[in-house]
């Protein structure tokens, strides 16, 4: 396995670790509605950071974006909006299925759809089947899916042992939302594929290969921001128990406390895709679809590890922890299989 591929896998791991940890600061926010908290964090992660970093990277910010036709920018934006819809469905999936089943189904579907649809759309899926390296990477995707399933099973055992139940368990509604979440969340993978002309243009301007994907985030995350912020602002305006004015009428120290924590959560959320871009840059072009598989499987892996570190599994008993550990090992094996396949 080459050093470039190894570093690509490593940066995807770092990005996934940030994704697994990003909600921790949000949990410390006090006396704010989820909608206000999510909006503040989202403004930082989807608007401020993408724009600021792109302004630093590009020699001429406005000239870069105005150089693209609407036919180039629109698919990137719409796939970003698609991914934003997946974000909203993710929370509803947890509500009706519970954390473990919801995450397992949603992540499993988005891993498959986001990973395999890209080479199918690009018309080179047959190359993957007909080459040794391609077959090896596909095997890695299958093993990763098995690993996600094992971790999901561990979560179910933990919830059963600790008496944790879904907020409003509804299997039929939850499954529909989980499938929708999985499909729509793959929009980020499709957006990255559609944004290749933007990456190439950034490279032509002399942007370092590690950073060429970052300017496209202005458009991708702009699509996601409109969906997420629109959802939050509509709820803040229409739901009687929610009030943006009330949330910002608290004592000044508490407002500052909440804003800083929400901004930190937004920063950590953005960093997952900052390092995703670094990892994506190190993956061989013919296997760039594997970036999504690495990100999502490492997200599940890091989520399990973070749960152990935060002692969330302390009262779950030995069996759930053993199953979780097995699932984490399987995901690590999957990453190595994919790495070997890409090296071939």
From Swiss-Prot:
Domain of life: Bacteria
A Pfam family assignment: RhaT
Catalytic activity: L-rhamnopyranose(in) + H(+)(in) = L-rhamnopyranose(out) + H(+)(out)
UniProt keyword Magnesium present: no
Keyword list, A-Z: Cell inner membrane, Cell membrane, Membrane, Sugar transport, Symport, Transmembrane, Transmembrane helix, Transport
Membrane topology type: Multi-pass membrane protein
Transmembrane segments: 4-24, 38-58, 68-88, 101-121, 137-157, 175-195, 214-234, 259-279, 290-310, 323-343
UniProt-recorded name of the protein: L-rhamnose-proton symporter
Origin species: Escherichia coli O45:K1 (strain S88 / ExPEC)
GN (gene name): rhaT
